[in-house]
Amino acid sequence: MRRAPLALLALVLLAGCSSEAPKPVAPVAKQPPQQETLTGRMAFQKLYQAARLWNADARCFRLESAITKESNGRDGKSGVWRAIFASPGRGIARPFTWSGLTADDAPNPGVAPAGPEDSFNPANTSTQPFDIVYLKADSDQSLEVAQKHGGEAILKKDPNQPVRYILDWNPKKSQLEWHVIYGTAELDAKLNVAVNASSGDFVRVEK
């Protein structure tokens, strides 16, 4: 009667010896940080929300993209946008940035103030705030317009040509305008095309 338990014990020991040891789990490869770019209008929405928390009457008078290693603006988008908002009631202004990049030449991801508060003069027409309802045409649409007025030839000639975008109010024409700048700055730009930010229509070639 003792043979059965002994045989069963032998089978258990044999199974234990023959089973394979668990294999070590391979470490999961670390994924690179997600790099995000946005059109000007999409970035403006994020910046506007932050500015309204800063001051309830905050209004923007300038929005501009930045050129970085990860984002050169050729698709109508940027990984970094900077906006300057004014509080007419308090007579102050403050810049904010949105960043979707983790590069060393870009601000930390997210929305944050980009500097201290400064004085603001509501009577200064060069820094006249605009109403958000005028912003209907986006930066990528403005790029398409600029491409038809000299931009296409520039990008075809130089695949690495950066493109910047500036949004501000034109007090002479009482309209909001995009400035599509083929270059890192307005002064040394190869081309600067103004586009109506409400209708998306071509306005003029500024350079």
Label every PLM stretch briefly.
Residues 17-207:
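Long, terminal "pre-/pro-" and other extracytoplasmic accessory regions
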Residues 1-15:
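Sec-dependent bacterial lipoprotein signal peptides
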